[in-house]
């Protein structure tokens, strides 16, 4: 159906390019091509603006679409919550929550991610916005345990991990979410705030 809708989308939203990437597992289950039956433009890097924040999105290397637009209002709200606080962003990906916190007036922002490419992209996005953020390339679970041992605390902590659950019966994935949240909660300062996403 997407090929039928594209002309209408172009007309309504004055779009210029099309990039379609169907999740490999979904394409297999639905028996559809990974392109959704649409010839995509050969687009890799695109700069966007969201609530005044600039991002560079990598469609070829990013997770899913390269950017999670459904979190845009949450990123803005997070920035408002960050004013005057020390902020920790776990599994920071492209830096959306970190950058919003820094631009929202956070005292200090620390961002952690396991994926080197994500950390590099987050750094580029922070530079686009002149946002001061301490980035760390590390496994969140190991890093959290070290911070707990060191007695570190943050006023505002967010955990927005990648997909851990790969099926209805994936108990390992459920355990990972539980473990991440249990560890992260130990780093929240008294009267601090904790945000978790999945």
Regions found by a protein language model. Give the residues of each.
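Mobile active-site "lid"/loop adjacent to the S-adenosyl-L-methionine
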Residues: 118, 154-183, 189
């Amino acid at each position: 159906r997407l090929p039928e809708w594209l002309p209408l989308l172009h007309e309504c939203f004055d779009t210029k390019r099309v990039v379609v990437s169907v999740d490999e597992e979904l394409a297999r289950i639905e028996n559809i091509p990974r392109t959704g039956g649409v010839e995509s433009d050969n687009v890799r890097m695109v700069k966007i603006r969201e609530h005044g924040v600039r991002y560079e999105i990598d469609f070829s290397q990013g997770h899913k679409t390269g950017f999670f637009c459904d979190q845009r209002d949450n990123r803005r709200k997070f920035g408002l919550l960050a004013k005057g606080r020390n902020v920790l962003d776990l599994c920071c990906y492209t830096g959306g929550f970190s950058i919003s916190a820094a631009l929202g007036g956070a005292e200090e922002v620390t961002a952690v991610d396991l994926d080197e490419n994500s950390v590099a992209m987050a750094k580029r996005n922070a530079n686009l916005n002149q946002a001061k953020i301490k980035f760390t390339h590390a496994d969140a679970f190991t890093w959290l345990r070290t911070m707990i041992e060191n007695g570190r605390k943050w006023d505002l902590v967010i955990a927005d991990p990648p997909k851990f659950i790969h099926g209805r019966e994936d108990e390992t994935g459920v355990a990972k979410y539980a473990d991440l949240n249990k560890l992260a909660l130990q780093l929240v300062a008294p009267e601090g705030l904790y945000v978790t996403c999945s």
